């Protein structure tokens, strides 16, 4: 996941993202890729606890240089998309786990990344909320986003178009599923 997210550079082989060899890029270029082309969704949400949902979602746009007058409008759009239009002014510690994860998903989308990396995004939430998160990911995938997700939950992995099982750093099973609408990387 760290290599896919351009957080680590591969020591062998080639990683090409949007026609660029990642291992040949400068630190500044890698930071730019992480900010603009990749959306990250973490198991622990990584929200600022005393900051509103709206401001948490606006934060990546500040780093990307999006004009301040546009940030709020864009953040509101994505919070409404994940069903939190009525919770925008709540701080993250006033939100349920599922709501916090939806804020994290909205935050990952505000710069319209082509790749979304989700590390155990349903691991800390109730099963009903996990299904809501998977529905959001399916919708995003249908809109053209590539979703790579790590999960240990087989019922969550069943939402995938493809499941890759990795054990001890090696692929031991690669299964394509033709019914669903999401690409997932699983770890077993």
What residue spans do the PLM features occupy?
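ABC family nucleotide-binding domain
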Residues: 1-166
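Conserved switch/coupling elements of ABC/ABC-like ATPase nucleotide-binding domains
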Residues: 168-172
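A short, basic/flexible loop-to-alpha-helix module at the beginning of a structural domain
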Residues: 176
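Glycine-rich Rossmann-fold phosphate-binding loop(s) that bind the pyrophosphate
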Residues: 182
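Hydrophobic/small residue at the entry helix of a nucleotide-binding pocket
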Residues: 185
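N-terminal Rossmann-like dinucleotide-binding module
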Residues: 188
């Amino acid at each position: 996941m760290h290599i896919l997210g351009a957080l680590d550079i591969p020591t062998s082989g080639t990683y090409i993202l949007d026609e660029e060899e990642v291992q040949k890029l400068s630190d500044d270029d890698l930071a730019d890729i992480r900010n603009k082309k990749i959306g990250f969704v973490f198991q622990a949400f990584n929200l600022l606890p005393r900051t509103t949902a709206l401001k948490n979602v606006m934060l990546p746009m500040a780093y990307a240089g999006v004009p301040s007058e546009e940030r709020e409008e864009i953040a509101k759009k994505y919070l409404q998309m994940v069903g939190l239009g009525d919770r925008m002014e709540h701080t993250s510690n006033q939100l349920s786990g599922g709501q916090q994860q939806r804020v994290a998903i909205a935050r990952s989308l505000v710069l319209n990344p082509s790749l979304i990396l989700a590390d155990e995004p349903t691991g800390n939430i109730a099963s009903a909320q996990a299904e809501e998160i998977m529905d959001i990911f399916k919708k995003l995938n249908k809109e053209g986003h590539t979703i790579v997700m790590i999960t240990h939950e087989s019922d969550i992995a069943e939402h995938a178009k493809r499941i890759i099982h990795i054990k001890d750093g090696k692929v031991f099973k690669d299964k394509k599923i033709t019914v669903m609408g999401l690409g997932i990387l699983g770890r077993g």
